Amino acid sequence: MKRVFASFLLLVAPLAVFGQQSSQDEAEKLRQQLKEIEKRLQKVEKQAAQDRIRFGGDYRFEAHSIAATIPDYYDGMALQAGLVNTMFYYGATGQLPTSPAAVQQFIASHYGDYLYFTNSLTFDQLKSAMASFPPQMQQQLMMMLLPGAYRHGYDADNSLMYTNRLRLTMDADVAENVTFSGRLAMYKTWGDSTAVQVFNGQANSFSIDGNTVGVPNSDILRVERAYFTWNNIAGLPLYLSIGRRPSTGGPPMNLRKGELRGGTPMGSLIDFQFDGITVGYHLGEHSTLRFCYGRGYESGFGNGEVLKQPADRLEDADFFGINWDVYSDDNTLLQTTVARAFNITDGFNGLIVLPANPLTGQPVNAPVVMRFTPSANLGDMDIAGVLLKRKDGPFDWFLNVNYVKSHPDPVTTPFGGLFSDPFEVPKSHSGSMWYLGGRYTFNNDHTMVGLEYNHGSKYWFNFTPAQDDIFAPKTAARGDVAEAYLIHQLAKRFFVRLGVINYQYDYSGSSWHLGAPKKLDSKPILGFPTYDDATVVTLSMTARF
């Protein structure tokens, strides 16, 4: 029996081993097949994802050389400090001082009282005190303080500055008739990623929601655009688009950059990152009418409004406008933009380093980063413009005329009111701007040369803090600006650009709706120094992908 059993084992054992080996082979074969299927699925999913989202972008290096001058002026902050100090002296002694030195001696001997006075001072108290002085006394006071506030003009050059800009674009077909578009952007100067500049009176030294990637800021990649568009609503040529809008780089500003139209509104009126809604209707193959809404300041979140009584809270700042491509095809664009901004505030939420207290005029000795929150609604502002842009063979050209009108409330703050100084009663003013340019393309479309010129009047103002100019938005100038440039394609999607811009400012306050414009050759009183002329040479190299 044992022999039979042993023989059986000898017979079965190889079969068992063979069967086990066969099972392992099958399992291994199955695993290989699963891996192959998994790879195919991953490839399909990757392809599907790539089909859903299309990525692109560009990187730009720029080198800038700036030669600028500041004209003779009276330092408004120093003058403000002198007024406040004199108020303290007058309140304690009942008489005007004989000299600024007498005020300083009095402050030194009563410094504790002086600190209490300046810390508790309000702008309304300051205005009331100034209004209580008879004109003769005001003149006497100014004659005493002005000499100490005088500043000789000086150069404000920057021989060489470099910047990096990275933009990543994405588009997706979400569903039938629904699309998504977005753009992330980073823009910085070499050697700085602080994201906050020391305020120097220029609009590009104040970081707000409207210009976070429009002026050099930091190495932070920010959301410049993110919006969906719902087309063919109810079977009509009607669409709805909501989100952070494509509101920068609009025509004709794209021409001088050698780019396609980058934004919807006219770029010489609105070049401002904002969140909003557009309802559009295609009137025909070559005409689109758009109704646009946006919010520039949200009062009810993040500003401590709950801590205030309802009567003391600010209104939201909104705008509503019409943007009509009257006719648009490959060779012609006739466009008009009309808009009103409601309840404009004395600035927008942002981060800032203030060198001086705008109420007391006293210097802020430490570079303190602070959140700036508006303190008042100042009124409404109307803007309107017409643009004709043409392509005739190798020559592109455009004509553009714009208009602005203020509707102020009788409100001022330490920064002023709509087109008025802090101690004035604001009045309605209007301004205008005209702009023309041309570009010639040759060398088998590899090279372009262009010339542009624009002029802004005394009360000209537009919403262009994100305009792609390193020195200042050129279309915001209250004066004359001339630009010449050359763009050459070095390789496919690789470009070099050399540009020169000359600014000749006539009035102060370009880019600002606050403060009264002042003739710059009249030794004006300025809250902050401003340029009267500047020349900017810029070399750019851009890789698009």
Regions found by a protein language model. Name each.
Residues M1-K2:
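N-terminal secretory signal peptides that target proteins for export/translocation
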Residues F5-L11, F18-N158, T169, F545:
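N-terminal periplasmic/intermembrane-space "pro-region" immediately following the signal or transit peptide
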Residues Q21-D25, A67-A68, R151-D155, T336-F545:
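Outer-membrane beta-barrel pore domains
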Residues R60-A81, G182-A195, N343-F348, N454, ...:
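Short, solvent-exposed beta-strand-terminating loops
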Residues D72-A78, V196-A203, R256-G262, Y297, ...:
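Flexible, surface-exposed loop regions and adjacent strand-edge segments
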Residues Y114-R165, S207-S218, P367-N377, S420-P426, ...:
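Intrinsically disordered, low-complexity acidic Ser/Thr-rich regulatory segments
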Residues A156-F301, F320-L334, S430-P465:
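Outer membrane beta-barrel
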Residues D271-G276, D318-F319, N323-D325, A472-I487:
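Outer-membrane beta-barrel signature, preferentially recognizing the C-terminal barrel domain
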